[in-house]
From Swiss-Prot:
Belongs to the CsrA/RsmA family. It is found in: Cytoplasm. GO terms for biological process: bacterial-type flagellum organization; mRNA catabolic process; negative regulation of translational initiation; regulation of bacterial-type flagellum assembly; regulation of carbohydrate metabolic process. It comes from the Bacteria. A translational regulator that binds mRNA to regulate translation initiation and/or mRNA stability. Usually binds in the 5'-UTR at or near the Shine-Dalgarno sequence preventing ribosome-binding, thus repressing translation. Its main target seems to be the major flagellin gene, while its function is anatagonized by FliW. Homodimer; the beta-strands of each monomer intercalate to form a hydrophobic core, while the alpha-helices form wings that extend away from the core. The gene is csrA. This is Translational regulator CsrA.
Length: 83
């Protein structure tokens, strides 16, 4: 991990198109501004972890759930059959 010390108004450049600016420091809180292209997703760590957890939960589908979906599909003829 690279550790840098910056003062209010100073910046850090990442790559060619991401700039982080220290805007304000109050006690143990630091307010930063981030300039980045729209396609770069920027999340606070706690939101990233929550999103990751939700994605894992959403991907956990039981075989019975899948069978139920397939049975409800009118074109489904069962395993080993062709349509």
């Amino acid at each position: 991990m690279l550790v840098l010390t910056r003062r209010v108004g100073e910046k850090i450049v990442i790559g060619e198109d991401i700039v982080i600016t220290v805007l304000k420091i109050e006690g143990n809180s630091v307010k930063i501004g981030i300039e980045a292209p729209r396609h770069v997703k920027i999340l606070r760590e706690e939101l990233y972890e929550e999103l990751k957890s939700e994605n894992i939960k959403a991907s956990e589908v039981s075989k019975d759930d899948l069978k139920g979906v397939l049975k409800n599909d009118k074109g489904y003829k069962g395993p080993g059959t062709s349509s």
